[in-house]
Amino acid sequence: MRKYETFFIIDPDLPDEVTAAVDEKIKSVVGANGGDVVSYVPWGKKKLAYPVKKRSRGLYVLMEYAGDSRLVAELERNMRLDERVLKFITVKLDDRYDPEKEAARMAANLPSFPEDEDTEEKGSAPLAREEEGIGEEAQTDEAEDKE
């Protein structure tokens, strides 16, 4: 199983009952295709960056789930056909998903991507090399003659 994240936007003008029905439909597609919903977080109504299907606002939802590529294809097919879903995007998070490790991580409240311990010790690499002579007066033969 792989872990995926789908971010989608629902029409904000829908009543709460219809929005709940869309949520349940999406979760049921994941369950019916052998997937597990890891987290489902509604972000609320927000202004869109640009109009989508003549809407300037949308109800944002972030869902993490585990499954295979057929599940992703079926979920995206259902979202494409559902007029209540304005936009969506799916991203693969992990190649291998272990439900036991995920449960332990959630219990410990750790991020799903561990930070590299070496980065704190090493610090960040300098972006550019400091070159000699930048910001300093260059000495020429003429400057020495005047003195």
Curated annotation (Swiss-Prot):
Residues 103-147 are annotated as: Disordered. One of its GO terms (biological process) is translation. InterPro entries: Ribosomal_bS6, Ribosomal_bS6_sf, Ribosomal_S6_plastid/chlpt, Transl_elong_EF1B/ribsomal_bS6. The keyword Ribosomal protein applies. One of its GO terms (cellular component) is ribonucleoprotein complex. One of its GO terms (molecular function) is small ribosomal subunit rRNA binding. Residues 133-147 have a biased composition (Acidic residues). Keywords: Ribonucleoprotein, Ribosomal protein, RNA-binding, rRNA-binding. It comes from the Bacteria. Belongs to the bacterial ribosomal protein bS6 family. NCBIfam families: S6 (TIGR00166). Binds together with bS18 to 16S ribosomal RNA. This is Small ribosomal subunit protein bS6. It comes from Syntrophobacter fumaroxidans (strain DSM 10017 / MPOB).
